[in-house]
């Protein structure tokens, strides 16, 4: 399957709040369709919805998600926790968590258009896996800084995770360490994703 480019609010109404997909929030209890649809949920449906939350939040294709699950399965530790750590350490997600972009698709666009440097080198791959001590900056060009300036100037919607630090005057972010499981931005049962 390809990356989802359709209406985002439909997915949010169906799956709940996904901060990486869009900044919009569904009205609580006002949607009649969800009240009609809330019948008995099968185990398959529960697992599928958890997997879809993960896919749409991080902007992954089905193949990418399968690859991440395979890598997490080979690593030491809980497969679900390792999977979330791998996804949280992607460059597009780190830009979103630093507040340099409003959504993960917006962060992907910044990376694809070569506005972002990692350790002084241009990186144009949104799935680039950041490591501890990586320094993430924008190009020195005025256009690159102007794209990010609005997002850095506004207060972040949520608290900055402990594994990241940002210097908003120099348009620079630093990855201090691998993310801890309590700072993961999406509330999800990762074991259901692995079981799916």
Swiss-Prot record:
PROSITE patterns from the UniProt entry: RIBOSOMAL_S4, S4
UniProt xrefs under InterPro entries: Ribosomal_uS4 (IPR022801), Ribosomal_uS4_bac-type (IPR005709), Ribosomal_uS4_CS (IPR018079), Ribosomal_uS4_N (IPR001912), S4_RNA-bd (IPR002942), S4_RNA-bd_sf (IPR036986)
Domain S4 RNA-binding, chain residue ranges per copy: 89-150
Location of the region described as Disordered in the Swiss-Prot/TrEMBL record: 16-36
Main location: plastid
Any GO CC annotation of this UniProt entry: small ribosomal subunit
Keyword field contains Iron: no
Alphabetically ordered keywords of this record: Chloroplast, Plastid, Ribonucleoprotein, Ribosomal protein, RNA-binding, rRNA-binding
Annotated compartments: Plastid, Chloroplast
Single GO term (MF): structural constituent of ribosome
Record-level GO BP terms: ribosomal small subunit biogenesis; translation
Disulfide bonds: none
Any Pfam family matching the protein: Ribosomal_S4
Subunit structure: Part of the 30S ribosomal subunit. Contacts protein S5. The interaction surface between S4 and S5 is involved in control of translational fidelity.
Entry similarity comment: Belongs to the universal ribosomal protein uS4 family.
PANTHER family xref list: 30S 40S RIBOSOMAL PROTEIN, SMALL RIBOSOMAL SUBUNIT PROTEIN US4M
Function as written in the Swiss-Prot or TrEMBL entry: One of the primary rRNA binding proteins, it binds directly to 16S rRNA where it nucleates assembly of the body of the 30S subunit.
Protein name: Small ribosomal subunit protein uS4c
Gene: rps4
